[in-house]
């Protein structure tokens, strides 16, 4: 029976160990494993040193044995061979040089040697029965190596990438005029400005169309409304006239303006009086206007915000655009010829001109259609070489010129759902045609129509596929054979549109770009595409796809090369099986087996692990007959009760049942054999010691290969800060401040209401116009009449104003009360005067006369008789005295006023004489005269 490993029963002198042939050189194998320092791999110097070393050891070992005859070691007795214990080893010489030793020492040495030569508890040994041919195997033939593909359908084409258009719509607008009112106070030797304010007022639309754009002139008068009343201002407080417009002193790029005057009029009055002067400067300024989506208002570069869409008009459905003003404030003129502001000449091309008059400014701009001038998407990049491939149900558009990859769904995107997106198809088709003419006109043909896809991050990819001329010829040949059409071929390969809806914009802050929607006629009811502010994720996606493609291609090539290498190694395995079939079978089957070749097939038997058997290694490798064992002899048993079996230690702890592996004995014999978990060392075919694994250096033939295929990863856009957060980082929001300030009057006041004046002013204005039409004389007469009427109106207005004042009303009430009291007192006085004039006129005199009369009459005397004549005379005297008093008062008043005095006295005298009865004179007695 052939032993495992290929060792023969009787080897020749030149044979080596088991499994070794003349053409196998261990030095070269070790040199390949360990490098130049391995044994057998050195040069001539290393070989000479090794030869000298072996010669020295041979002389040292041959010297003691030179005096002894060469004897053959006796064969072991049969009874010892049956014992499971190893044969006795020669005892070491005693101290006196004899070979004998004491019985106790011999017993201890034998016990120690027996323990050292026994296998450990964790040792594993295998017993392999000889292959009988019951199981026959063969090597598998070479395999065909597959060519790995990435599994993607690439389509070459031209792409145009669009993003969200966040740029505002800009256009030119024109605004008008300034009014400056200055109040001064004049002193004796100086003048001071006590107040000055500037007000911006609008210009009438008729003045703009008839004067500014026709004659390049402007009136020096301004009419406007303030606090519900109409105000008229004149430049330099003079009559209005048509002033020419002249360029402004300071001009800058994009900022142009024209005006009528440079002076600010300041009026100076008399000393100690205030005087107000007015300046009207007609300013025509060209400004830049900006409007953002949804275009419901626009802002001027002056800070004014107009709450009307710049596309508001009266035709083509533009009246549905947003406006916050009454229709009377807006006017649109078709076929309007405007004037060039730089040269002052009238332009030849007519335009549609919009005019809007607000409270402080008149704005004019050219009306244009909305859909043709604004677009919610803007062209970002053109990719003249774009590849579209399908991966995991998605499309990937790779633009190497941009180093970016965009991922989208496999369905096309309907741009009809995006408001104001008509520009995308037109611009993209024009860009694709231009790129094709410049680069691919002679090498490729366009296939199919323009397709649009919504990529992640809010990018719209317009892709036009194309084919190379060679591939197009193949398609045409295929169509000729199948009688098909080119449209049908491309339609079968093109992606089918699906129910794709536009991605709606993220909720924004109130008043933000996405807070309002425009009219339904422009498609604003659909969703607007919102693009992220950074495209780094597309660059990362391109980088990852590039690395993934490169690594997967490398792995596929490595797998193919591995397959080819396995096919080539199959031939080596076939040859190795002929040299050592058991080792080849064990390596191929991945378990311990014994095998032998049966021609081109192999007989295999599986080895069995020795359970709890005991294995002992013997201390000598010398065999009877002058030969030596090539493998150490062992004895093993299955369990405690089984008979021991003599055998040899095979390779890798294999137990061979017989002892048939022998070789000629050689000098300087040194061998290491694997025994259980350790190694045993033999020198000159005698057991020396057990060698742990740590004392032997390990050389490995394994090459580690740890490969992991990269998984598919898609980078998603991540916004760290939203637009609302970025806009809210500043301390103040200037646009919001302006919006709130200018919305104040619109929110809380009615700027369109006009307070009507009274009829007196209308009458005065009519009289003034009447007298002005009569010439110079009429104007002079009108001035006098209007002055008098104005004085009367002023007096009445002053009285009304005084009464309207709370203090004036109180004073008026007190005056009325005082008048009533005075009237009551006057009424009492008149009543007393009528009843007793003498007492009323001369109360003191009458009282004194009465007292004298009472005192003159003595008590007890009789009163004299009453004289009726005297009483009548007294009455006449009192009457004339009152008349004289009245005449004197009238004359005094007449003298004081220097008119009407004598006339009034004469009339009173005549009146008194007319009513006087003819006098009856009686001559008085002389006694009375003398007594007087």
UniProtKB/Swiss-Prot annotation:
Entry's localization field: Virion membrane; Host cell membrane; Host endosome membrane; Host Golgi apparatus membrane
GO cellular component, one term: virion membrane
Gene designation per UniProt: gB
Intravirion side: 828-932
SS bond partners: 128-607, 145-563, 218-282, 375-423, 628-665
A biological process term (GO) from this entry: virion attachment to host cell
Disordered as annotated region, ranges: 1-25, 67-105, 492-527
Name of this chain's protein: Envelope glycoprotein B
Compositionally biased intervals (Gly residues): 511-526
Start and end residues of each stretch annotated as Hydrophobic membrane proximal region: 751-804, 784-804
Keywords: Disulfide bond, Glycoprotein, Host cell membrane, Host endosome, Host Golgi apparatus, Host membrane, Host-virus interaction, Membrane, Signal, Transmembrane, Transmembrane helix, Viral attachment to host cell, Viral envelope protein, Virion, Virus entry into host cell
Transmembrane segments: 807-827
Membrane topology: Single-pass type I membrane protein
Coiled-coil features, chain-numbered ranges: none
InterPro entries, per the entry: Glycoprot_B_PH1, Glycoprot_B_PH2, Glycoprot_B_PH2_sf, Glycoprotein_B_ecto_C, Herpes_Glycoprot_B
Annotated Pro residues bias: 71-95
Lineage of origin: Viruses, Duplodnaviria, Heunggongvirae, Peploviricota, Herviviricetes
Organism superkingdom: Viruses
Annotated organism of origin: Bovine herpesvirus 1.1 (strain Cooper)
Internalization motif, short sequence motif: residues: 921-924
Function: Envelope glycoprotein that forms spikes at the surface of virion envelope. Essential for the initial attachment to heparan sulfate moieties of the host cell surface proteoglycans. Involved in fusion of viral and cellular membranes leading to virus entry into the host cell. Following initial binding to its host receptors, membrane fusion is mediated by the fusion machinery composed at least of gB and the heterodimer gH/gL. May be involved in the fusion between the virion envelope and the outer nuclear membrane during virion egress.
Virion surface side stretches: 63-806
Quaternary structure (record): Homotrimer; disulfide-linked. Binds to heparan sulfate proteoglycans. Interacts with gH/gL heterodimer.
Glycosylation sites: 105, 153, 441, 483, 640, 706
Segments of skewed composition (Low complexity): 1-12
Family statement drawn from the similarity comment of this UniProt entry: Belongs to the herpesviridae glycoprotein B family.
């Amino acid at each position: 029976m052939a032993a495992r490993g290929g060792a023969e029963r009787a080897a020749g002198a030149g044979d080596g160990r088991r499994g070794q042939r003349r053409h196998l050189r261990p030095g070269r194998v070790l040199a390949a494993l360990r490098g130049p320092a391995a044994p057998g791999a050195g040069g001539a110097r290393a070989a000479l040193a090794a030869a000298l070393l072996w010669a020295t050891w041979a002389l040292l070992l041959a010297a003691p044995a030179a005096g002894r005859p060469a004897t053959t070691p006796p064969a072991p007795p049969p009874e010892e061979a049956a014992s499971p214990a190893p044969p006795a080893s020669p005892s070491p010489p005693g101290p006196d040089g004899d070979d004998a030793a004491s019985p106790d020492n011999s017993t201890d040495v034998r016990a120690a040697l027996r323990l050292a030569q026994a296998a450990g508890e964790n040792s594993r040994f295998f017993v392999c029965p000889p292959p009988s041919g019951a199981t026959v195997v063969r090597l598998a033939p070479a395999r065909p190596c597959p060519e790995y593909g990435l599994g993607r359908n690439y389509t070459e084409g031209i792409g145009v990438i669009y993003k969200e258009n966040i740029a505002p719509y800009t256009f030119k607008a024109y605004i008008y005029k300034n009014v400056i009112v200055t109040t001064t106070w004049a002193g004796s030797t100086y003048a001071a400005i006590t107040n000055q304010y500037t007000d911006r007022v609008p210009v009438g639309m008729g003045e703009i169309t008839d004067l500014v754009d026709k004659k390049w002139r402007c009136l020096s008068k301004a009419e406007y409304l303030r606090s519900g009343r109409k105000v008229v201002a004149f430049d330099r407080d003079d009559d209005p006239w048509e002033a020419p417009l002249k360029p402004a002193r300071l001009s800058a790029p994009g900022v142009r303006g024209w005006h009528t005057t440079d002076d600010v009029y300041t009026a100076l009055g008399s000393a100690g009086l205030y005087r107000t002067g007015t300046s009207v400067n007609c300013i025509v300024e060209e400004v830049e206007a900006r409007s953002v989506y949804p275009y419901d208002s626009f802002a001027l570069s002056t800070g004014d915000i107009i709450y009307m869409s710049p596309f508001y008009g009266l035709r083509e459905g533009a009246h549905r655009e947003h406006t916050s003003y009454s229709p009377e404030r807006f006017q649109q003129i078709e076929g309007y010829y405007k004037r060039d502001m730089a040269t002052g000449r009238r332009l030849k091309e007519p335009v549609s001109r919009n005019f809007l008059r607000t409270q402080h400014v008149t704005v004019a701009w050219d009306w244009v259609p909305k859909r043709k001038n604004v677009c919610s998407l803007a062209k970002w990049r053109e990719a003249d070489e774009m590849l579209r491939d399908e991966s995991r149900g998605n499309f990937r558009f790779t633009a190497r010129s941009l180093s970016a990859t965009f991922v989208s769904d496999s369905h096309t995107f309907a741009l009809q759902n995006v408001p104001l997106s008509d520009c995308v198809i037109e611009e993209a088709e024009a860009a694709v045609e231009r790129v094709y003419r410049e680069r691919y006109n002679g090498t490729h043909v366009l296939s199919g129509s323009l397709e649009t896809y919504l990529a992640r991050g809010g990018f719209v990819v317009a892709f036009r596929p194309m084919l190379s001329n060679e591939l197009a010829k193949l398609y045409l040949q295929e169509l000729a054979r199948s009688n098909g059409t080119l449209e049908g071929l491309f339609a079968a390969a093109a992606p089918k549109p699906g129910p794709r809806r536009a991605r709606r914009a993220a909720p924004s802050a109130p008043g933000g770009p996405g807070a309002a929607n425009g009219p339904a006629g422009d498609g604003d009811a659909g969703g607007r595409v919102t693009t992220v502010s950074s495209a780094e994720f597309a660059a990362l996606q391109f980088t990852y796809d590039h690395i993934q493609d490169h690594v997967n291609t490398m792995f596929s090539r490595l797998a193919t090369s591995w397959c080819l290498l396995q096919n080539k190694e199959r031939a080596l395995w076939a040859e190795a099986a002929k040299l050592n079939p058991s080792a080849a079978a064990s390596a191929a089957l991945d378990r311990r087996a014994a095998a032998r070749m049966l021609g081109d097939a192999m007989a295999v038997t599986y080895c069995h692990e020795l359970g709890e058997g005991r294995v002992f290694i013997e201390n000598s490798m010398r065999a009877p007959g002058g030969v030596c064992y090539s493998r150490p002899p062992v004895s093993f048993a299955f369990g405690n009760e089984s008979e021991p079996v003599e055998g040899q230690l095979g390779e890798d702890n294999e137990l061979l049942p017989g002892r048939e592996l022998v070789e000629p004995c050689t000098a300087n014999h040194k061998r290491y054999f694997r025994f259980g978990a350790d190694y045993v060392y033999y020198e000159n075919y005698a057991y020396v010691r057990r060698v742990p694994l740590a004392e032997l250096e390990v050389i490995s033939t394994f090459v580690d290969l740890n490969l992991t295929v990269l998984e598919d990863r898609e980078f998603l856009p991540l916004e760290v800060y939203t637009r609302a957060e970025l806009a809210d980082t500043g301390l103040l929001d200037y646009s919001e401040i302006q919006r709130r300030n200018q919305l104040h009057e619109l929110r809380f006041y009615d700027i369109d209401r006009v307070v009507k004046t009274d009829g007196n002013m209308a009458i005065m204005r009519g009289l003034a116009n009447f007298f002005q039409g009569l010439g110079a004389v009429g104007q002079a007469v009108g001035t006098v009449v209007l002055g008098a009427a104005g004085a009367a109106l002023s007096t009445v207005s002053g009285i009304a104003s005084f009464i309207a004042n709370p203090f004036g009303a109180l004073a008026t009430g007190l005056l009325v009360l005082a008048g009533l009291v005075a009237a009551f007192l006057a009424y009492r006085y008149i009543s007393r005067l009528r009843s007793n004039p003498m007492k009323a006129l001369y109360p003191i005199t009458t009282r004194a006369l009465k007292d004298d009369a009472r005192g003159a009459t003595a008590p007890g005397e009789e009163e004299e008789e009453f004289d009726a004549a005297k009483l009548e005379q007294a009455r006449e005297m009192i009457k004339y005295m009152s008349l004289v008093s009245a005449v004197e008062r009238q004359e005094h008043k007449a003298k004081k006023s220097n008119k009407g005095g004598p006339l009034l006295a004469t009339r009173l005298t005549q009146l008194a004489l007319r009513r006087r009865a003819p006098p009856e004179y009686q001559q008085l007695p002389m006694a009375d005269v003398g007594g007087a």
